[in-house]
Amino acid sequence: MQPLTHEPIMTAMPTPTNADGIDASVTNEPTWFQTHFIGCMEMFADAKTAAEYFDAHQGWFIRCAHPMKAKPIGANGYALTIGKFGSFGYQVEPKIGLHLLPQDEGVYRIETIPVPNYTPPGYEVDFKAVQTLVEIPFEPSEELAADGSTLPSKMTRVEWQLDLKVGVCFPQFIKKLPEAVIQKTGDRILAQIVKLVSNRLTYKVQEDFHTSQGEATLKLFKKHWQQTKGRGVCEQVSPAL
């Protein structure tokens, strides 16, 4: 897997300053962008085993989030710094607080919480995610079945949904651009960020989980990933949850 870049997804122009005669003062009213995604992680174990892993997120979340920076907030929260993103000469380095609620009969929810001693500089984030553990019979492909390895009888699909909204207080010089241009660009960048983070985080969590289950299970996961190329991991949808 390639490391998560901390460079902007879009190449930004040099940041204007007042010395250039451009109004760089920030507006008070945020412009809101939103995106909605669904996806799935496949775990080659029963739901009980998968749930035990997710319940013990303190042991893997920070490690799997790397190279993003993650710091604990209490027992079930994390302050996550995503990286630098931007366009039109304006960049932000989002830091969000995420609360991983304890499971409720195989359902996990993640929501936004404040980051202690931190005020977001010109942006707001509303993050709502739901993960559901679904245990199903394992039906291997012909290639996996012919491998001769011992295969599990059950597997768990971790089906997730994300509703993400971000409000940004732009400088005045950006607000002079057509509203439709700002909206379209912002929505697109937000979707790119979600795809980038989700694809890499999903792989690392799956790899970490299957490593914990032994060499044979890790080998099975990697073969399956090569066959599927990560299909279904992350897909943008509409409307909102």
Predicted segments with their positions:
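Short, ordered beta-strand-loop transition motifs
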Residues: 70-76, 101-105, 150-154
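Beta-strand elements of well-folded, non-transmembrane domains
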Residues: 39-47, 84-88, 94, 100-106, ...
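A conserved amphipathic terminal alpha-helix motif
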Residues: 177-230
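Beta-strand/loop substructures that line and gate deep hydrophobic ligand-binding cavities in soluble
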Residues: 120-187
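Domain-wide signal for the mature, well-folded portions of proteins, strongly enriched
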Residues: 62-68, 98, 124-135, 157-166, ...
